């Protein structure tokens, strides 16, 4: 008998799930479900809240817009909220949209403008007297990040408007994108440098525009399309003509924009781009429909989350059927073994797909995969497409179930699986060639030792037995390099110069490059801030490590395990003898200990001092800064417009919110 879940319980469960996915999508830019699943859960929650209004709550995901606002940029309030659009997936719901618009306009005729829905980062540009003065991300819809310096590097963004008939004050909204060709180039470069790949062009665009160095942004060739204009001064009489006006002023407006006089025109537009979108140079994830007349838009107004005069139509992810040839396995630098499906080549979203992710052993068992199975594959933006189903009716009687390997595919060592882990690992860290080469590539990455060497050269050096661990780089000689195929004196000198320069890399970069399990770039910075030398970190206890914000028992155990191994201690000594930086250049000395042992989070905007000045005050008084709220947070220095997610988590954990005045009194006592 199916268990009946009380409405109140289901409502809270949906809110919890949606909040988690909003955080992963909007804050981490790392979604774990697709838009279709998210929208289905959101619709279910909206229906339950309508049916049971006594369980409605102002902090429900149905009453808010997600946030992509990050620390490190000035927060700016939008003159007009940047709201999201309601989504629909079929023609019946488009018909419902037409009905609602008609009722809202009391039967008056209206036109619809159909546009492509670009899949990038929403941006608001402010122009004064034809000059770009500010660029702000969507953020939480109310507040966003000032990324003007980065946006100025995008060549499709006009710094000065063309002509002279533009209004004195103008806001233009659009989408920042990374073209597919540029995405492939950047990922190829990152792979060669041993850096993690971007999952999709949207993540890459978002990560790029939030870089603190505009030079990095300029080197990634972002693009931008624009789709809405605001001004208190007169503009063209309707939305379509305003887009044409924007094009004349120098903005990039999609050629696909179409004026539709009927539902049939809209359906024809959707059908057309169901296939044409697959050949576009940038990512799209649907169609946007807008009422054309601004006066009618004003009459229809807004809900708490979205305009009533616009809606988004989302295409289903492209799904194809192909044959699973066999399963191969890859070994990462940490020893994790990942299964990969090798497929009969098939065309998906304009690219030929030969492989698909199988995640782990549990996924293979859950799908009950057999050799030679016909599988359904989707490519929803990931680098490697995913298998979403199996055509069991087409299964051959000779097909054998796929059993996850018990041996490392590279060194034949029996695999292990730690309790609570989904992945199997090869424990032969020092003898497994793939792990060794993976660690060498990781160490040379731009955010680590930054040695200018590609995986092909590392493979060559490894095959000649010239390198086995990262300390071996510092023992290489010109004579050795000149024995390699294709290496001349100039190439050898360039590599040796890069290796020499890596000795001066910051301590936290070298710590990251050591490849300690679970110690990524951010964790390495946190560890280096508390333990300003490798020796101090090696002497730390588990109890001390877990006191650091966002350092849990798992990370602490990995750090302790790394330093417990003799070969790692010997590696560190070799790096020290080679002259590699293993301690911070300077250690800041607090001017007081009023905040000693306190972990502080800063959120919002302030009147008396800037965020950076308050961060300096915390550190000068012996406190430690953290970017997110946790059970280890001592208090939050809360300004106006504090982020809703931080406020919600603070209330849940009972973390104190401290005002500017309270904080200044505290450090002046």
From Swiss-Prot:
Gene3D superfamilies: 5' to 3' exonuclease, C-terminal subdomain, 6.20.10.30, BRCT domain, DNA ligase/mRNA capping enzyme, Helix hairpin bin, Nucleic acid-binding proteins. GO terms for biological process: DNA repair; DNA replication. The active site is at residue 117. Residues 590-669 form the BRCT domain. GO terms for molecular function: DNA binding; DNA ligase (NAD+) activity; metal ion binding. Its EC number is 6.5.1.2. SMART domains: BRCT, HhH1, LIGANc. Residues 61-71 have a biased composition (Basic and acidic residues). Its cofactor is Mg(2+); Mn(2+). Keywords: DNA damage, DNA repair, DNA replication, Ligase, Magnesium, Manganese, Metal-binding, NAD, Zinc. This is DNA ligase. It comes from Porphyromonas gingivalis (strain ATCC 33277 / DSM 20709 / CIP 103683 / JCM 12257 / NCTC 11834 / 2561).
